[in-house]
Amino acid sequence: MNVLIVYAPSSCSTSHRHILESARDCAVATLQKRHHAVTVLDLTSFDPVLGAAERGAYFSDSPLIDAVAREHAALVQDSQALVIVYESVMVTLPPSLKGWLDRVLVPGVSFSVDEAGKVRRGLLGLNWIVGICLYQDSWLATKRSRDGGRRILLRCLRMCARSTTRTSWLALYQPEHQGGVENRFIGRVQRRMAKL
C-alpha cells in the first residue's frame, strides 16, 4: 500500500517537537516493516500562502500552477493511506497544514464539480485517513472548542474520499502535564500503524 505521511510541525517547544518526530518516525518504521511504500512530506519549508495567481486559477481547468503543489497533489492521488502528523494550534490546524490543504487539495484533485454543480469525490483511492495530533490544551478544553483540526481532517477530508474510507485519530493532550505519557502514545501509534 502507498502511504503518504504529512508532517506539519508548528513553532512548538523542543519537547513537543521531539514527541511529534518520534510519532512520525515510529509510523514510518512500522509501516515500512509491514512492507508498505512510505513517502514523508515535511511541511516545515512549505509556503502555506495561497497567492493571487493560485486563487485566480482555483476553479480553472488547471488549478495547480505551482510545481511543488502539483508534486504533492500527485502523491496524494497515488496514496491509499494518508497519515497526518501535527501539533494543534489553538485547537485547529497549524498554518502550514491548513495552507497545504488549500493549495494541494484543489478542484480536480480532491473533488470536482460537474456541469450540474454537483460536487464529486476525487480521492477515491484512499482507504485510510489517520490523524496523529499533539494538543497543547486539555481533553475537556479541546472538546469544548469542538476540535476544528479533527473535524476538518476526519469529516471534511473524508467527504472527498470513498464512503468506505476508514478513519482513525490518535491524540495526546498536554504532554507536559503527564509523566511517562510519551512512550504510551508512541506505542499507540505503533499499534495503529501495524493495523493499516
Short names for language-model regions:
Residues 140-144, 148-196:
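Glycine-rich phosphate/pyrophosphate-binding loop and the adjoining helix
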Residues 113-159:
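Short, glycine-/small-residue-rich phosphate/pyrophosphate-handling segment
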Residues 1-109, 187-196:
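N-terminal beta1-alpha1-beta2 submodule of the flavodoxin-like/Rossmannoid cofactor-binding fold
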Residues 1-4, 126-131, 167:
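Hydrophobic beta-strand segments of well-ordered beta-sheets in folded domains
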Residues 85, 132, 173:
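Conserved residues at the C-terminal ends of beta-strands
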Residues 48-55, 130-133, 169:
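Short, basic/glycine-rich phosphate-binding loops at helix/coil junctions
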Residues 9-13, 135-139, 174-177:
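A short, flexible beta-alpha/helix-coil linker loop
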Residues 107-112, 163-167:
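Short, structured loop/turn "capping" segments at alpha-beta junctions
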